[in-house]
Amino acid sequence: MNLKHIPLLLLPFSLQLNAQEIKAELNKEFKRQEKMSYILDYPKNTKGNVPLIVFLHGSGERGNNLELVKAHSPFTYKNLIKEPVAILAPQCPADSWWDTVTVYNLIKEIQKKYKIDASRIYLTGLSMGGWGTLKLAMEHPEMFAAVASVCAPTDQVMTANIQQFKDLNMKIFHGGMDDIVLPENAFKFYQKLHPVNPTAELVIFPNDNHNSWDSTYSNPQLYEWMLSKKKEK
C-alpha cells in the first residue's frame, strides 16, 4: 500500500466533517426604486367614483414617447364606451418586458390620487401587454373585476398557477392566422383555464393575424361586458 495516497483518500471524509447544513428563512423588506411613465384619461365633471380600465401596450410602443401607448387601444375607441371611465396606460421602458410589480403599485397609487371605484377595475393588454395582463391577473386576481388578454404569449408559470384565475371574469382573444404569437398559446392556456373557470371565454378571429386588437377593441360589446362586472368585496 502506498501511504502517500492516504490523505487523498481521506479528504472527502474530512470535508464532510467540516460541513454543516443550515436551514433558515429570509424575511426582510427590500426597498427598490420604481419608475414608470403613464397616461391617465380621467373624466371631467363626474361625481363619485369612476371605473378604471388599465391597458398594457405591446412591444412596439415601448420607450419614452407616451403618445405611442394610445395606439391600438381603448383610447382609440373611447366613443364606444357609454359611461364615464378612467383609462390608465403605463409605458414599458425600452428593451424590457412588463414589470407587473410596478404596474400593480401604479394602480394602487392612482386609486389613492383619484376617485376610482375599487370594485370596477378592469385589465386588458395586447401581445406583450397581453402577457403582462395575464401575469398581473395571476398575481393579483383580487384586484380586477374583468380581464381581457389579446394575442398574448403565455408561459408555464401561468399554467402552473392556473387556479389563480378561477374566480376571474375573463376573455381570451386571438387571431386564427397569427404568425407572431401563434394561436396555440391561447388554445393551450384555455385548455388549462376552462376546467377551473368554466365561464371564461376564448374568442378566435379566424381571419386575423397578430392585429386581433383591432377586432377586439373596436367592438362595443367588449366594454359593455367589462363594465357590467363588479368585484365582490
Question: What do the PLM-derived regions correspond to, one by one?
Answer:
Residues 17-52, 85, 131, 136, ...:
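A domain-start/cap signature at the N-terminus of enzymes
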Residues 113, 119-164:
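Primarily recognizes the serine-hydrolase "nucleophile elbow" in alpha/beta-hydrolase
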Residues 66-79, 106, 152-163, 184, ...:
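Alpha-helical scaffolding within the catalytic cores
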Residues 1-21:
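Bacterial Sec-dependent N-terminal signal peptides
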Residues 170-173, 179-233:
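C-terminal catalytic histidine-bearing segment of alpha/beta-hydrolase fold enzymes
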Residues 52, 56-102:
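Active-site machinery of serine-nucleophile hydrolases
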Residues 44-48, 95-128:
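Gly/Ser-rich "nucleophile elbow"/oxyanion-hole loop immediately N-terminal to the catalytic nucleophile
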